[in-house]
Amino acid sequence: MAFKIASSPHVTRNLQTSTVMQRVILCLLPGLVVQCAFFGWGTLIQVLLAIIVALSCEAAVMKLRKRSIKASLGDNSAMLTAILIGVAIPPLAPWWMIVMGTAFAIVIVKHLYGGLGHNLFNPAMAAYVLLLVSFPLQMTTWIAPSTVALNTPSIVDSLQLIFNVGAHVGMEQFRLGIDGISMATPLDTLKTDLSLGLTTTESMAKSIFDGSTGVGWFWVNLAYLAGGIVLLKLKAIRWHISTGVLAGLFVASSVGFLLSPDTHASPLFHLFSGATMLAAFFIATDPVTAATSPRGRIIFGALIGVLVYIIRTQGGYPDAFAFAVLLANLCAPFIDYYVRPRTYGHSAG
């Protein structure tokens, strides 16, 4: 009788790419719902528009490459990229921005390098940086949270603003911020106030702040944190990168806060402001563009956390996760080279 000899590992989990992507998308939903609750229908509209563009671009590229369109769309990677771009940009950004960013992410960043599993940079963050550098005003003008806004646009108002239709007096007031609909994010506000000589305590006395965090942003981050914990429980991601990101940001912000509390925000503010939890659990954990070994993943995550703090406090862009992730993507091959696991029976290196 002939026996089949199989190499290790002998116990495996049959998790397909589409299954992992589905789990990530489902775990994103709590954060998306809370974000829509505080910042209106615009976020949902941007996400839906991004999904349409992403799937269309994915199908077009697959047709040109003579690959299976059904298989490519079925892995859900394009949809996940679209959702991440949609929740990252301001809710009322013009429609052509989300179209441009999503097309760039799918066609250039993803497929120019060979498609899924071959891209050097995170597609969603590369698209975000393209839009931020090209259109800084539109990318830094966020809608005021519903709890402090004088006016919150309805779904019809949001559609009119995004697609630039219905240019009557009311819509012009919304666009110009006369009704108090738009304002800077807490990170932007704090950075501007500190540059004007205000202390963190004086800056956080403004209505956009709720104690030690930003209004709305604390709950948005908490929702993404909850989704991230479920993602870990489902074993769709590993803990190393997320822990490294949060630990790196916490340690760096703690040092700054202890040395100068008047000019540096608390670690709690940094952890629950901007895209911290979204990036820590759903963006930095991209297995294609991150380091591969367990120790390398921790270093990779910690590098992102430290870079975020440095860019937030010293750079020109307050929410620095996109730049930090892309810089860490560049460093991933070096981390893998110098932090290789030792093969049993051989020396390290």
UniProtKB/Swiss-Prot annotation:
Signal peptide: none annotated. GO terms for cellular component: plasma membrane. The modification FMN phosphoryl threonine is found at residue 185. It holds the Pfam family NQR2_RnfD_RnfE. Its main location: membrane. It is a multi-pass membrane protein. It comes from the Bacteria. Its cofactor is FMN. Coiled coil: none annotated. The chain crosses the membrane at residues 36-56, 77-99, 124-144, 212-232, 239-259, 265-285, 291-311, 315-335. InterPro entries: NqrB/RnfD, RnfD_bac. Keywords: Cell inner membrane, Cell membrane, Electron transport, Flavoprotein, FMN, Membrane, Phosphoprotein, Translocase, Transmembrane, Transmembrane helix, Transport. One of its GO terms (biological process) is transmembrane transport. It is an enzyme of class 7 (translocase). It is found in: Cell inner membrane. Its EC number is 7.-.-.-. The keyword Cell inner membrane applies. The complex is composed of six subunits: RnfA, RnfB, RnfC, RnfD, RnfE and RnfG. Belongs to the NqrB/RnfD family. Part of a membrane-bound complex that couples electron transfer with translocation of ions across the membrane. This is Ion-translocating oxidoreductase complex subunit D. It comes from Shewanella oneidensis (strain ATCC 700550 / JCM 31522 / CIP 106686 / LMG 19005 / NCIMB 14063 / MR-1). The gene is rnfD.
